[in-house]
Amino acid sequence: MARLFTPSESKYYLMALDAGTGSIRAVIFDLEGNQIAVGQAEWRHLAVPDVPGSMEFDLNKNWQLACECMRQALHNAGIAPEYIAAVSACSMREGIVLYNNDGTPIWACANVDARAAREVSELKELHNNTFENKVYRATGQTLALSAIPRLLWLAHHRSDIYRQASTITMISDWLAYMLSGELAVDPSNAGTTGLLDLTTRDWKPALLDMAGLRADILSPVKETGTLLGVVSSHAAELCGLKAGTPVVVGGGDVQLGCLGLGVVRPAQTAVLGGTFWQQVVNLAAPVTDPEMNVRVNPHVIPGMVQAESISFFTGLTMRWFRDAFCAEEKLIAERLGIDTYTLLEEMASRVPPGSWGVMPIFSDRMRFKTWYHAAPSFINLSIDPDKCNKATLFRALEENASIVSACNLQQIADFSNIHPTSLVFAGGGSKGKLWSQILADVSGLPVNIPVVKEATALGCAIAAGVGAGIFSSMAETGERLVRWERTHTPDPEKHELYQDSRDKWQAVYQDQLGLVDHGLTTSLWKAPGL
């Protein structure tokens, strides 16, 4: 590719738009991967009245927020728009956007929109109850968060929108479209629709035909890092970027996060610790899990896929515990000028491994085909305040998250026969030194912590640089730019202790699922259609 910019001649930067579940961010990096500035705004995805499980994505308001973030990032960086060499976008997966014939976005939903529960059940019965299996074998996805039941819901309940729809994209593609006026999807994000073939990295319209849905709404597929278009004059007025700035195809947040971590080769493994914890393992070729417990997604690196097993609400659970029970610690931490989690970790470090036998019951390991969880609770508490207190419960939560993570990695190993020798731990959870060490002790693997905490945005910026001709290879650039802050080595004795804790927790969790099955307790989360 011809170089559009010569970094040695001028100081250029790359912008990444990161559309997460809870916020939109515009992050500016220099060409060595250093974060220069960020603009951020929270957004909320509200339920539609009388539509249970819905999570609408407000296209007009959220585009305004995205533009504000881009302007804020440019202002905070103190650089002129002409020095942004290229921009790309990544987003939460599963969220979809529909457009009419004029190219106007007309409807969108966020990632865990669960309005289509009845449609999921209906689709599962198709073709002698084999339809979901056919979808999974071809795409690596089940129906729970797929676009197929959502489209069927629109056909049933909003036929006006369904009839108008002429194109479908992901939220990252919508951002790129709003900047450039060009519509396309990339495999890594579109793969989560349940409509993209893992092997060909292209749409599989036969699945829509099998579901009795229209197959004429599928937009062009372009690989991450491909030049899509340029910022239009209209978009430039709104967002502050210069008209003509290259707009590059982005991708899914997890896969681009792995690019930003240099996790770009087969068998490399990462744990991304945010609101959800994603345990991902790179696979050299498409393969799916015979038990259908694990999802499989296209990587942003062509030809490679990622087995992904998800822990539910891990980061959210920690935030709930902090906000619900640790008001005193929040005040103390504020006076000390430290993060509340840092103080809680210091307290938890004095609790012995195993947390006096306390067992948190929150997320289960991923069971993609029948995905639900037990009711949130703590089991095996003691009334001895020296043994059962906030520090004990906090450590127990960190240990349990690590146990669930290890279970998720194990079930990937069971079907892929890939046994990692180390793992990368990134995201908010990796800021905790105690948590990182516990993950090493539980998994029995060395845990590497990167310097860059904005791995997803960095991966997106790398894609922008490739599309602009600044970088020649996404994989090589990801490996070159990643830097390591520290490594945690597992303690064999603690690993053995945690193996016993893991076995006990798995047995207790199964009993807790039974209470949900009998209607005695309420699941933490249940996939649509169960």
From Swiss-Prot:
Record's keyword terms, sorted: Cytoplasm, Kinase, Transferase
Enzyme class, broadest EC rank: transferase
A cellular-component GO term for this protein: cytoplasm
Pfam assignment, any one: FGGY_C
Subcellular location: Cytoplasm
Record EC number: 2.7.1.189
Tagged with keyword Kinase: yes
BP terms from Gene Ontology: carbohydrate metabolic process; quorum sensing
SUPFAM superfamilies: Actin-like ATPase domain (SSF53067)
Coiled-coil residue windows: none
GO molecular function ontology, one term from the record: autoinducer-2 kinase activity
InterPro entries registered for this protein in UniProt: AI-2_kinase, ATPase_NBD, Carb_kinase_FGGY, FGGY_C, FGGY_Carb_Kinase, FGGY_N
Endpoints of the signal sequence: none
Cystines in this chain: none
Function: Catalyzes the phosphorylation of autoinducer-2 (AI-2) to phospho-AI-2, which subsequently inactivates the transcriptional regulator LsrR and leads to the transcription of the lsr operon. Phosphorylates the ring-open form of (S)-4,5-dihydroxypentane-2,3-dione (DPD), which is the precursor to all AI-2 signaling molecules, at the C5 position.
Record-linked NCBIfam families: PRK10939.1 (NF008187)
Protein name: Autoinducer-2 kinase
Organism of origin: Escherichia coli (strain SMS-3-5 / SECEC)
